[in-house]
A protein has these predicted regions:
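Conserved catalytic cores of very large enzyme subunits
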Residues: 1-432, 436
Length: 438
């Protein structure tokens, strides 16, 4: 209570107070904005001065610091966000996506791994909880001991830390027009998005989720959704829910047509959501913590930030890639069955003897993530087919303050008939999450 009475006015005087302030600010932001993907950022970087100050004064030991960090992690997991059942079911409960990252390069290009980096890893060992969503940055000159510490934590089965490769992430940010010094200071947002702490806008992802597996399913059925019977974009003039593709090139062109159609719609939905959020959910407290917001006299949702970079949440690129490869290989190259036979097998959910034979062939087809170049290339093609669309998309905040304002790519599940099947081949079973292999 003594700390709470003074520390926000005079600033943190100790490592303990610094952790308290970090946690309080985190909680206030969650309360203001319904608690989704508010992240601690580069905790080991901005807390290092207080840690070293207290160690030098003799008022803190490494063991004390570990206890404080561990307690902060436990307190973070005491928070909750009530979600719809659909989200709870497919997101393993009630995740908050409160990302905390350690390690990696500093803005000056030097390695930033320090004692706090290791203490945070040890704290996650002790907690063994799903939150904070723990990440680690690494690069070619990262200390081997740091990479090994991360590997040992991953080996426990907790699934963390998520590993972010600096050379790759920094190059991606530079390609968006982010200055190198800021790009080197990036941190993960929520799960896999990257951004510049204290300078990014109000969200890293779009307000829409586009299930690419569903897009492929609709494409294969000539614009019909087989679950509802609704038809949105006919590919041919035929009323039949089937397209008799003659070769892979025709199939690929159809994919690009449908991807653009649904991506365009999702950007329009984003704009509708953004216009409402700017009026009804301004986030004044969070806006005060972002550079240029006060200078521009705008909230985050009006463009009060340095960089306004958002992405779509695109579900299942590997599902699409695996499916396209299976069709390319088994229908067009090996001619083991026809497109019509494949769709018939999916419609009866692989239950008949003939369908099970087709399913067996589909399951044996190469899958993304197994170092098989032909299918991996098709998955890469799927990614690039979306990247080619992004230059046409703008946010509502472009030209209203941010120095960089654009769309980029992100990659989240329910699809019925998609011919990628390994364990996932049947209707209403789960597909892979996000951009993960099946």
């Amino acid at each position: 209570s003594d700390m709470a009475a003074t520390m926000l006015e005079q600033g943190a005087r100790s490592f303990h107070e610094g952790c308290e302030i970090v946690y309080l600010i985190h909680i206030w932001q969650m309360i203001e904005s319904n608690g989704h993907s508010f992240c601690y950022g580069r905790f080991d970087q901005y807390m290092l001065d207080l840690y070293e100050q207290d160690i030098k004064k003799g008022i803190l030991t490494k063991e004390n610091a570990l206890e404080i960090i561990t307690h902060m992690f436990l307190m973070n997991s005491s928070c909750n966000k009530v979600r719809p059942y659909g989200h709870t079911r497919f997101s393993q409960g009630y995740p908050l996506y409160s990302n905390l990252v350690v390690g990696g390069l500093m803005p000056n290009g030097k390695d930033g791994t320090n004692t706090l980096s290791y203490l945070c890893i040890e704290a996650m060992h002790l907690c063994s909880l799903a939150e904070p969503n723990f990440s680690a940055r690494y690069h070619k000159d990262s200390p081997r001991s740091f990479v090994e510490a991360c590997a040992k934590l991953i080996r426990t089965g907790c699934g963390m830390p998520s590993m972010f490769h600096d050379e790759t992430a920094v190059a991606g940010l530079l390609s968006l027009g982010i200055p190198k010094e800021d790009a080197l200071d990036y941190c993960p947002i929520g799960c896999v998005e990257t951004g510049v702490p204290g300078k990014y806008g109000h969200r890293a992802t779009g307000m829409t989720y586009v299930n690419w597996g569903k897009v492929l399913e609709i494409m294969l059925h000539n614009g019909y959704d087989p679950a509802s019977g609704i038809r949105m974009l006919p590919y041919t003039a035929s009323e039949e829910a089937f397209v008799d593709f003659q070769n892979y090139e025709e199939l690929w062109q159809a994919w690009k047509t449908y991807l653009k159609f649904y991506s365009d719609i999702s950007v329009q939905c984003d704009a509708i959501c953004d216009a409402s959020l700017a009026v009804y959910d301004a986030d004044p407290f969070a806006s005060c913590l972002i550079q240029d917001s006060l200078k521009l006299g705008k909230t985050l949702k009006e463009g009060g930030c340095r960089y306004d970079v958002i992405s779509q949440s695109n579900i299942g690129p590997s599902v699409v890639g695996n499916s396209l490869y299976a069709i390319k290989k088994l229908v067009f190259e090996d001619k083991r069955f026809t497109m019509k036979e494949l769709l018939a097998a999916m419609h009866d959910n692989w239950q008949t003897e003939a369908s099970r034979k087709i399913h067996k062939l589909v399951k044996k087809a190469a899958k993304f993530g197994n170092d098989q170049d032909e299918v991996d290339k098709i998955v890469a093609d799927v990614f690039y087919s979306y990247l080619a669309l992004l230059s046409d998309y703008e946010t509502l905040r472009k030209g209203k303050g941010p120095k960089v304002s654009c769309y980029t790519m992100s990659t989240s599940n329910i699809t019925s008939y998609v011919p990628n099947g390994f364990v996932v081949g049947r209707s209403e079973e789960h597909t892979s999450e996000l951009q993960s292999p099946n």
